[in-house]
């Protein structure tokens, strides 16, 4: 009695399985809902219809495409559907529903896309028990339904699948016709029994194919399914086996995990999960909406029998290869191999034999546990026991197992030879994240993709655990970070995250409430389009915000309440009245309100003798690191294009004074005023050096610290100390001694003042331990680290200066090489914008 090659299913039937095929016919309910396609391992050496192959140029991947089979005999692959080449990678092109002309029925389609072979054997059975179909043949069911054959879809070891039209309606269905043989009839009973249990569940919610009815046609079992569009293998083949992005793999993984979770709750094992058995429902309306098909190899958990030929080889779990007892966890292994293939565009373990399959697995996963090997019925087929005289922690009883070499296996087996069929050879699963990188010009998009890859590899490793007891379950997979996307929630402003949420919402959305997405061309049935999910609200692009002019008086511009996150970083144009005589002419000013907290905490001030841990410059959250949202609170009017009326520069003032935490705009140095204000160092910076006794006694001098270590308080403290003696000195560079700052005449063009701090080398003398003049800054430029050519700003040395250099004269400023000095007014809130043209930026911002 021949055995079904792709199944190896036991002859023991489920307790709920029918005893005869007539009982099986009555289990399935009559047609009720949507129609989809169901096929199994469709291969066809002899095709009763001429197949239209999709045009396209063959690529290297297409020529090297491995054959998708479970048995080890060579069978030519055949497309499961008529496809057309699509230039769009994200979705496949759906061909129009074929139709056959009929003068007697007004509901019949009016065209046909497949032609039948000329034959006189109508409805004959071949020598292998396969039914020979012809064009326009009508299959009648006992429920009064008639199905007219439209198109041949494919065939396999079980039989064949055709596309048919349900006469009197506009519905297109898929009919699977099994071979006329007792073994296939029994397998059909098992599939009907499982489908009858699934018919009570919501197929749209749990993402598995919907079956409508089962009947006999000339002693052949016929199963009627709803019609689906295209399987994932054909989708990959159509796109030249290009890898799928993670945003496309995620919804597929989510839907298949949902189906496996339902099967696990029913105690069912699919046992043949592969890309051919995951079908795209409607790529145009619902991209990456999939359903699981082919329950011909499925069984109940209690009826699972070891040493059976289950699963296609590329997706076969190690417990099946070794001949161990199995459960629903074999489907999780298969799903892991499927998503790895979608990510790589090539099977992860494309073994040409079971030996190659287990050899590829061991190369990346290591040897299976000893407990598994000792219980394996096929142990000596692939492994060799090695005796050892010195037992250790790696072996039990002085022996261990190793995989046979290729030469040893070929010498012991005459059926199959080892072949290298892998496109990518990995030593560890983590190396998968290093291949198939796409080009992302946006650093935020690249960062999201990199983080997403790490979580994808993490869930993949949990699905490909050798020990089935520790393999991840469907429920745990649905709670993983890769599926829930909790790891990228902080990047909701990125297009990558927006696209990920959009695709997940589409796959969660139920399909159209109609009988089938396939209808005859001449039937004027209104088709309700699938509603597009509302896109989440994003920040307006800058080009859309700039033309908006806001009238402002003496108050600040309030933030837009409907825009979260980066609202206070959006750029606005404002109009101000320039006091030019009696007529106030309008002038545009570039206004940017400051954020509540600076992007960089660039003034973490501490006294060197204070008993406090060191503080370093910390970055803000990733949502504030977008270049287009870097704040520019104060800007030179000459930086903006256009004519500026007289008096505009004098009217330019800081508008966000309350956000900058200063009493009034007049309290901050007017950088563009005719006479800039002068500043002096605060008292705590100009105090004398504390004595060594005080330092070694551990008593910190009574020096006021800036409030909450905030840079804003530094600017305020600097303004309050303007009347005291100045200690500001100008630093030239190198070892040149510092000279007191000489009074200089005022100039018409203002120049921002810059604090330059130095040690008291002159007062300490040449014999002092402090050699050389060194500076520290109160701010750090986050981008620029090149040497500044001139002016009042200097570049700090590339070597960190010991805290003893400054002693008690200067608070403990933490800085990095390449940091720049800033004016105390700058420290008070004038954060530079490194993305502007430096030729127009004031000196203090360089």
From Swiss-Prot:
Question: What positions does UniProt annotate as the active site of this protein?
Answer: 272
Skewed-composition ranges (Polar residues): 746-757
**What ranges does the record list as Low complexity composition bias?**
764-773
Q: Which residues form a coiled coil?
A: none
Q: Which GO terms describe its cellular component?
A: cytoplasm; nucleus
* Tissues expressing this chain: Broadly expressed during embryogenesis. Expression becomes more restricted during larval development. L3 larvae display robust expression in many head and motor neurons, and lower levels of expression in the intestine and the seam cells of the hypodermis. By late L4 stage, expression is largely restricted to neurons and is maintained in nerve cells of the head and nerve cord during adulthood. Expressed in adult pharyngeal cells, hypodermal cells, gonadal sheath cells and distal tip cells but not in germline cells.
- Gene3D superfamilies referenced in this protein's UniProt entry, alphabetically: Phosphorylase Kinase, domain 1 (3.30.200.20), Transferase(Phosphotransferase) domain 1 (1.10.510.10)
Q: Which InterPro entries match?
A: Kinase-like_dom_sf, Prot_kinase_dom, Protein_kinase_ATP_BS, Ser/Thr_kinase_AS, Ser_Thr_dual-spec_kinase
PROSITE patterns, A to Z: PROTEIN_KINASE_ATP (PS00107), PROTEIN_KINASE_DOM (PS50011), PROTEIN_KINASE_ST (PS00108)
Q: Where in the cell is it found?
A: Nucleus
GO molecular function annotations of the record:
ATP binding; protein serine kinase activity; protein serine/threonine kinase activity; protein tyrosine kinase activity
- Domain (Protein kinase) ranges: 147-483
Q: Which UniProt keywords apply?
A: ATP-binding, Autophagy, Developmental protein, Kinase, Nucleotide-binding, Nucleus, Serine/threonine-protein kinase, Transferase
| Residue ranges, annotated region (Disordered) | 47-74, 741-790
Q: What is its main location?
A: nucleus
Annotated residues that bind ATP are located at 153-161, 176
- What is expression of this protein induced or repressed by? Induced by heat stress. Transcription from the hpk-1 promoter is not altered by heat shock treatment, suggesting that heat shock affects hpk-1 levels through a post-transcriptional mechanism. Induction is greatest in hypodermal seam cells and neurons with much lower levels of induction in intestinal cells. Induced in the neurons during normal aging with significant up-regulation in older animals.
Query: Which terms does the UniProt entry file under GO BP?
Result: autophagosome assembly; determination of adult lifespan; response to heat; response to oxidative stress
Q: Where is the composition biased (Basic and acidic residues)?
A: 61-72
Q: What happens when the gene is disrupted?
A: Enhanced sensitivity to heat and oxidative stress with reduced survival under both conditions. Following exposure to gamma irradiation, no effect on DNA damage response in the germline but significantly reduced embryonic survival. Suppresses hypoxia-dependent expression of nhr-49 in the head, intestine and hypodermal seam cells. Significantly reduces lifespan with a rapid decline in body bend movement and pharyngeal pumping, indicative of accelerated aging. Premature accumulation of polyglutamine aggregates and increased polyglutamine-associated paralysis at day 8 of adulthood.
The text of the family note is: Belongs to the protein kinase superfamily. CMGC Ser/Thr protein kinase family. HIPK subfamily.
> What PANTHER family has UniProt attached to this entry?
DUAL SPECIFICITY PROTEIN KINASE, HOMEODOMAIN INTERACTING PROTEIN KINASE, ISOFORM D
- What protein name does the entry list? Homeodomain-interacting protein kinase 1
Q: Which organism is it from?
A: Caenorhabditis elegans
Taxonomic lineage is: Eukaryota, Metazoa, Ecdysozoa, Nematoda, Chromadorea
